[in-house]
């Protein structure tokens, strides 16, 4: 869990903003959303595989676009 130390004479909203930013960087909200409902292991594997395929397609598209620009 992210911990911030409130500095002397620091307004509350500034400290809250720093805390929210550190929570976002740690990925806490995404983890909570992911664990909100039970996901069967098969569904989890299927989702992970689909995201890997999507990542690969995106990478290949970028590389292909880079090659086209070179010529």
Swiss-Prot record:
This is Small ribosomal subunit protein bS21. Keywords: Ribonucleoprotein, Ribosomal protein. It comes from Buchnera aphidicola subsp. Schizaphis graminum (strain Sg). PROSITE patterns: RIBOSOMAL_S21 (PS01181). GO terms for cellular component: ribonucleoprotein complex; ribosome. PANTHER family: MITOCHONDRIAL 28S RIBOSOMAL PROTEIN S21, SMALL RIBOSOMAL SUBUNIT PROTEIN BS21. Belongs to the bacterial ribosomal protein bS21 family. The gene is rpsU. The keyword Cell cycle does not apply. GO terms for molecular function: structural constituent of ribosome. The keyword Acyltransferase does not apply. GO terms for biological process: translation.
């Amino acid at each position: 869990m992210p911990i911030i130390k409130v500095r002397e004479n620091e307004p509350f909203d500034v400290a809250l903003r720093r805390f929210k930013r550190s929570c976002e960087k740690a990925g806490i909200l995404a983890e909570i959303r992911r664990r909100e409902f039970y996901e069967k292991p098969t569904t989890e594997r299927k989702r992970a595989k689909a995201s890997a395929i999507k990542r690969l397609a995106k990478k290949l598209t970028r590389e292909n676009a880079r090659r086209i620009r070179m010529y």
